[in-house]
Amino acid sequence: MKMIKSVLVIGSIFAATTAFGADQAAVRVEPTNLQGPRPLEKQTEAAVIRDYLQAWHSFGTALDQNRADLLDTDFVGTAKDKLADTIQEQAKIGLHTRYQDRAHDLRIVFYSPEGLSIQLVDNVEYDIQVLDHDKVLTTQKAHARYIAVLTPSEVRWRVRVFQAESE
């Protein structure tokens, strides 16, 4: 009986957290045509894309729950600092924001000769909901061009620069 209750509680929590846009984002990756001394291996490209998309998930969860600690795995440097500041500011006024990415159009534009950074451009479509506690204040569709620079850490690529340019 305890097992059934646990499953029901976990299922309810999962359903509640995925109610706003449960669909997975469509991802399109443009072929990489980098000119330079260091070729981008397919395994590295796949890892960068996987980790960048995971960072989007962490970003959305952190802003929804107002928990900057959720950024630790996927963000470093100025990207992490700016997002943490945003979380602190919205929490201070009692708001939280839900991001649901709908589509990513990714293009890797730079891979450093030392292999210490990769820059990508992401034309992303997403939905934004701003909530005051659990009351929805606004829901908007957005399209932006993100510039991201990722650097390798011990086991994954982490986002160091995460800058949006609205369209």
Which stretches of residues belong to each language-model region?
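Amphipathic, hydrophobic N-terminal targeting peptides for secretion and organelle import
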Residues: 1-34, 164-166
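Exposed beta-sheet edge and beta->alpha loop/turn motif
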Residues: 19, 113-167
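Short, low-complexity N-terminal intrinsically disordered segments enriched in polar/charged residues
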Residues: 21-77
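Short solvent-exposed beta->alpha transition segments
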Residues: 39-42, 68-113
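Short solvent-exposed loop/turn micro-motifs enriched in small/polar/acidic residues
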Residues: 54, 101, 141-143
